[in-house]
Amino acid sequence: MAQATISITVNGEAKEVEATTTGVELFAEDKNIIAVKINGENRDLYTPLADGDTVEPITLDSEDGLAIMRHSATHVMAQAVQEVYPNAKLGVGPVIKDGFYYDFQVDKPFTPEDLKDIEKRIQRIIKSSQSFRRRSVTEEEALKEEADQPFKIELIEDKEAHLDPAAATEISEKELSFYDNVDRDGNVVWKDLCRGPHLPNTRYIKAFKIERSAAAYWRGSEKNPTMQRIYGTAWATKDDLKAYQTRLEEAAKRDHRKLGAEMDLFSFPDEIGPGLAVFHPKGAAVINAMEDYSREMHRKHHYSFVQTPHITKGGLYETSGHLHWYKDGMYPAMHLDEEYDADGNVTKPGFDYYLKPMNCPMHNLIFKSRQRSYRELPLRLFEFGTVYRYEKSGEVHGLTRVRGLTQDDSHIYCTREQMKDELTSLLTFVLNLLKDFGLSDFYLELSTKDPDKYVGSDEIWEEATRTLREVAEASHLDLVADPGGAAFYGPKISVQARDAIGRTWQVSTIQLDFNLPERFQLEYIAKDGTHQRPVMIHRALFGSIERFFAVLLEHYAGAFPAWLAPVQVLGVPVADEFAPHLAGFVKSLEDEMVRCEIDYSDDRFGKKIRNASKSKVPFILIVGEEDMNNNAVSFRFRDGSQLNGVPVDKAREQILAVIAKRVQVNSADDFNAAVAE
């Protein structure tokens, strides 16, 4: 009797295969294939194929393959933890960038020795070649199997758990399933609630490393129990793992928190609170240079500068929608202005005031403060506006995630006819300014509507999204989709920049908004005399001053280009008798607004040079007897190269030229090339 067959499409080609075929048989000859994409959905190799299926292989070294392998690694890690702590309660184990984590409720935090023991057990499990086998279950069956796992029970009973990105690794909207870890004898040695997919077996986990552990709240809420989270990473090859660890080592050297302390740039005093940075004189010098250049460029592009208060009545954020959509990210209300009589009775009701989380509502009030004409549009309002956002204490991170931040915030009001041209010129302005700060490798991300969290009509959102996409595509930069990633009031383009070691940072955002003008009843008088709504564009070029400062600090590893450097010139006299000559030259630079210091310490000259090199100053100026006699100075650069005996007038001219050109100079060759242009 002939074997029944089915028709499938594999990599675009039609094939007839036996009806019982799975991905295991289909791709048996290629051991690098670890899963399949069936009709666009990632599935295990063991998944039976059906007539009409479209099948694509997933290789271990692909993006999908790495994600599947890392998720399988979380199961192995959880199995190892429960070998050590049989009573550990399991949370969730999602894949994150370059790795994964798993949350556990245990009696005490994991120690470094615990993690070493767990990692050894992981290696034994991997070598045992356990297979991952999926089985579907009913809710009743799942609850019975997880009777001693309260966090899993919560996920099973939560009908919207699949909407939680971390929980979605466990729970599917369609059905519940478990994955069994099966040993070579066919025995189930461990299991976990999971939607999958997974590797065929543990031997495909080629390069694995536990990285660290930390406390975390269950499902990210401070109201929930504290879990112990173990982070790990896994890669397709040991060489890939080694390269990743090298990148981590380089990133650690560039960590802005470390450099900020070493270079005396900023701090986070406990007396002030988490996420609230204090910039020291040298850090503030960099901030001022960033802001001054930004102001200069905004003036050239016809922006109007405004200034708004840090606190406002809550009604403003009711109008804007922030209190409905964003209240959890705002500081609590302060009830003020209430008046009482002698008996304590309220004679005048007060108001709830809020620290502002965003500047846009106040800018809308400026637009609305008088009648506007089409002749005034586009109106570009700009402010370095400080805002306050309540980030959980466990989520603040250096300058990249803070509670108080200053945005280079602009809101542009234009007609619909002006919208596309304005967005095009705005994106060009943004990219050019970022290049002036030394970032040049970009791609764009288009964030579109979250169907569960938006205001305004679908038609308006579609128009806004289409226009942003056209502008982004016209830039000829790579465009990546971010479905559902937009704020509640409009779609946005974000500029993603790669730094000196290849990491990606979100910097600028450009957000189109048809909704806030409606909520604030903003109008202008059109050419035909009718009242029309303006289009509103939100734009933050740096994102925030604090975050962009951190990005630049890590990008340059503290060695800022001269125009941004906290100290641009450091003078080091060979001996005390040469200090007056050096001081006179430094004074002439300070008169030109160059940021200078002189080392007058009692240290030996060699130590002064070592200290100067550690400070990452772009220009170390040395004066000895020959320099003094010839009215000259000598340059020492970051790489140790020197230019000796440069006449002071020429040296001053060259230093000012390099600063004005905003170029990076780390060596004598760089310097000569810069001044020769």
Curated annotation (Swiss-Prot):
Task: Write down what this protein is called.
Answer: Threonine--tRNA ligase
| One GO term (biological process) | threonyl-tRNA aminoacylation
Could you tell me which InterPro entries the record lists for this protein?
Answer: aa-tRNA-synt_IIb, aa-tRNA-synth_II, aa-tRNA-synth_II/BPL/LPL, Anticodon-bd, Anticodon-bd_dom_sf, TGS, Thr-tRNA-ligase_IIa, Thr/Ala-tRNA-synth_IIc_edit
- Enzyme class (EC, first level): ligase
The UniProt note on the cofactor reads as follows: Binds 1 zinc ion per subunit.
Please report the stretch or stretches of sequence annotated as the TGS domain: 1-59
Q: What does this protein do?
A: Catalyzes the attachment of threonine to tRNA(Thr) in a two-step reaction: L-threonine is first activated by ATP to form Thr-AMP and then transferred to the acceptor end of tRNA(Thr). Also edits incorrectly charged L-seryl-tRNA(Thr).
Gene name of the encoded protein: thrS
The organism sits in which domain of life? Bacteria
List, alphabetically, the PANTHER family matched: THREONINE--TRNA LIGASE, CHLOROPLASTIC_MITOCHONDRIAL 2, THREONINE-TRNA LIGASE
- Cellular compartments annotated: Cytoplasm
Q: How does it assemble?
A: Homodimer.
Give UniProt keywords alphabetically.
Answer: Aminoacyl-tRNA synthetase, ATP-binding, Cytoplasm, Ligase, Metal-binding, Nucleotide-binding, Protein biosynthesis, RNA-binding, tRNA-binding, Zinc
Binding-site list for Zn(2+): 360, 411, 538
- EC identifiers of the protein: 6.1.1.3
